[in-house]
Structure formats: C-alpha cells, structure tokens
Amino acid sequence: MFTSAHANRSAQASASAGHYAHRSGEQTANGLISEIVYREDQPMMTQLLLLPLLQQLGQQSRWQLWLTPQQKLSREWVQSAGLPLSKVMQISQLSPCHTVDSMIRALRTGNYSVVICWLTEELTAEEHERLVNAAQEGCAMGFIMRPVRNQGTLGRQLSGLKIHSNLYH
C-alpha cells in the first residue's frame, strides 16, 4: 500500500485515525479525507488496515456509504467483516466523472460517518480541497481507494520497507 501526494500534504491526513474517533458516540472531532493506494493483487492488506476503523465507525448512529464502480457488496462479506448491515449503504454503477461530486454531497450532509469510493486517477488539488471542506462540514471521514496494478519488478526490487518474520520462514 502506498500513500499519495495529497495524503502527505495535509496535517489532517497524517493524524492518526484515533484522533478522529467518537468521544461521545455521535460526531467525529473533525473531517478527514485520505487516499489509499493499494495493489490489486493484495486486497487483504487494505482490508486489514481499514476494517477496524470501519467497525468502530459502525457503532455510530450514522450510515456508512460505499460508492463502488461495478461490483456490489455482498451481504455475507459485510456481516463477516463485522460491519453493521443495517447501516451500510451502497451506490454501484456510478460513473467515474460523478464519483467525486457524489462523495462531496454525501460528506457535506453529515448523515454518514464515512464515505468510501474507488477512483482510478489521482485527485486534483482542487478536488482534494473540496473533499476536505465537505468532510469538515459534515464531520465525516472519506476514503478514496485507488488500485494500482503490479507492474512487476523487472529484475530488481522496488524501494520500500521489507519486514522479515520467523513465523513465515
């Protein structure tokens, strides 16, 4: 998983998710927009990172909105992931050109604790600013999921952190 340029430019994006968790159980302290760039061949890594936060947000009275490109969330997956089926809403088959505007409108309402969408292209600076303002206005979190394909290493390792574990060797 990688972080995008927009995620690194905002002090809010670098704050821990716990800072934004509910104190009273009703409203987050502030809005947050985060772009999560992940490898399509390793979707479990993203789930391991996001599910605990989504489960915690599921304890709020507000909805969770998933703006998905084509696939529909399965009820079985939502339940097995520990998310409240009664608070998860999904809009699928959404055109990519309408996704950011739909996310802005949803965040602004304050009806959602979190809005998650999938985009294939990076956000512009103006789109990012509009999303941050909408998230702050609605005291909500927004996650932009952006998959990248594994391009292969072409004989050399990509730079990054490598953690060795005796549990797997």
From Swiss-Prot:
Q: Where is this region: Lon protease binding?
A: 162-169
- Matching InterPro entries, A to Z? Cell_div_suppressor_SulA, P-loop_NTPase, SulA_CellDiv_inhibitor, SulA_enterobact
Q: What induces it?
A: By DNA damage, as part of the SOS response.
Residue stretches of biased makeup (Polar residues):
1-15
Q: Where is this region: Disordered?
A: 1-22
Report if keyword Secreted is assigned.
no
Q: Does the keyword DNA damage apply?
A: yes
Q: Name one Pfam family in it.
A: SulA
Site (Essential for degradation by Lon protease) at H169
Q: Which UniProt keywords apply?
A: Cell cycle, Cell division, DNA damage, Septation, SOS response
What are the recorded Gene Ontology BP terms? division septum assembly; DNA repair; negative regulation of cell division; SOS response
- Please describe the post-translational modifications of this protein: Is rapidly cleaved and degraded by the Lon protease once DNA damage is repaired.
- The segment annotated FtsZ binding runs over 106-112
Q: What does this protein do?
A: Component of the SOS system and an inhibitor of cell division. Accumulation of SulA causes rapid cessation of cell division and the appearance of long, non-septate filaments. In the presence of GTP, binds a polymerization-competent form of FtsZ in a 1:1 ratio, thus inhibiting FtsZ polymerization and therefore preventing it from participating in the assembly of the Z ring. This mechanism prevents the premature segregation of damaged DNA to daughter cells during cell division.
Q: Which family does it belong to?
A: Belongs to the SulA family.
Its assembly, as annotated, is: Interacts with FtsZ.
This protein is called Cell division inhibitor SulA
Organism, as annotated: Klebsiella pneumoniae (strain 342)
